[in-house]
């Protein structure tokens, strides 16, 4: 047999073998900010990322997101964290309110003794400024203090309001998991 026949036979055999595997019908899209993927109703509050692997004594960023909101003029968010494992290093305004015609007010309070951070974002005045859609309300930089797993959860006191200060029902809450090693 000639060398070209052997090479051709090997290539054709390889193609038959490699094409024999079926492609799995699994969904590979698992973005926690995709409203078709989340397992709760909208509007909702969630975190991104929802799973964080961090080294002990290192910083990591997490964003608080409002998903599927309509006519949002203000938000009050309380995020609970394990005070023995995490420490808030910085909190700053996200991008959802920053795209509006009016500058928003952003205020936060970290209660490290009880393990929560309150974040208030709103528009002031009677201009009826509001935003809609999905976007970041705040960015928080945490420092991991100890090795282990801890959760970041939203408190039931969280509130979203429209320009007339009417509550917008929050139908879902995501949570985050921090694994520090």
Task: State each model region's role.
Residues 19-181:
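Acidic, low-complexity intrinsically disordered segments
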